[in-house]
């Protein structure tokens, strides 16, 4: 999908760059594959804000997307490509030979009428899913499981992908777009191709109101807050914060390592995504 820029006929149109979604399905989603979605405004079950800058926005229906791809050796035809308000990627409605319908993440170069299949060893074409044990090294992949049968967790956002670069015992080595090199079990499933909508990050929404429609609220800098609200707050007049940059909870930000050294998954990370910085 290409980008669409607008003439500055109004202040909100000036600089506006959006994704051209004219080729996507214009109707409503499949009712059996949707659920209601209530808003929480970034609050958890105790009512406290756990995710700042969230709230409001247009009402959404949740589309039930199949991240597991565990319906093996049954071919499915792509019925249509749809917009999903709950994620940056597009989704594809597929219909299996037995009549069942499902939503999957739409990879790049997947078109209406294409056939996709999940199998122990499938063709290397966008949308096909298989475990690493049946996949050739060098394959570009997305929707990667971290635990067998749990469903894809890595490389699900628009334009993202990873590369299968090697085998090591019962593990597969994958290189993520962040530069991280990590291991996952060879029984884990992954889908061939890169996720659709790679131009998503090049959009310019043009005005604050468009972000409010998406449920995004303003972000306030710590240095303009009061001391009770942020470690950078307070002071007479404009100040620099007076200390190294930290989060509202006092944790170093902008580059300092804050990962727990005892985290179990550290032994599965061969090369950190930070290794390219400062010669680490």
From Swiss-Prot:
Region span, Disordered: 226-280
Keywords: Ribonucleoprotein, Ribosomal protein, RNA-binding, rRNA-binding
GO BP terms: cytoplasmic translation
Pfam families: Ribosomal_L2, Ribosomal_L2_C
InterPro entries tied to this protein: NA-bd_OB-fold, Rib_uL2_dom2, Ribosomal_uL2, Ribosomal_uL2_bac/org-type, Ribosomal_uL2_C, Ribosomal_uL2_CS, Ribosomal_uL2_dom3, Ribosomal_uL2_RNA-bd_dom
Basic residues: bias regions: 254-264, 271-280
GO (cellular component) term, any one: large ribosomal subunit
Molecular function terms from GO: rRNA binding; structural constituent of ribosome; transferase activity
SMART domains: Ribosomal_L2, Ribosomal_L2_C
Alphabetical list of SUPFAM superfamilies matching this protein: Nucleic acid-binding proteins (SSF50249), Translation proteins SH3-like domain (SSF50104)
Function recorded in the entry: One of the primary rRNA binding proteins. Required for association of the 30S and 50S subunits to form the 70S ribosome, for tRNA binding and peptide bond formation. It has been suggested to have peptidyltransferase activity; this is somewhat controversial. Makes several contacts with the 16S rRNA in the 70S ribosome.
Protein family (similarity comment): Belongs to the universal ribosomal protein uL2 family.
Family annotation (PANTHER family): LARGE RIBOSOMAL SUBUNIT PROTEIN UL2M (PTHR13691:SF5), RIBOSOMAL PROTEIN L2 (PTHR13691)
Summary of subunit composition and partner proteins: Part of the 50S ribosomal subunit. Forms a bridge to the 30S subunit in the 70S ribosome.
UniProt-recorded name of the protein: Large ribosomal subunit protein uL2
Record organism: Roseobacter denitrificans (strain ATCC 33942 / OCh 114)
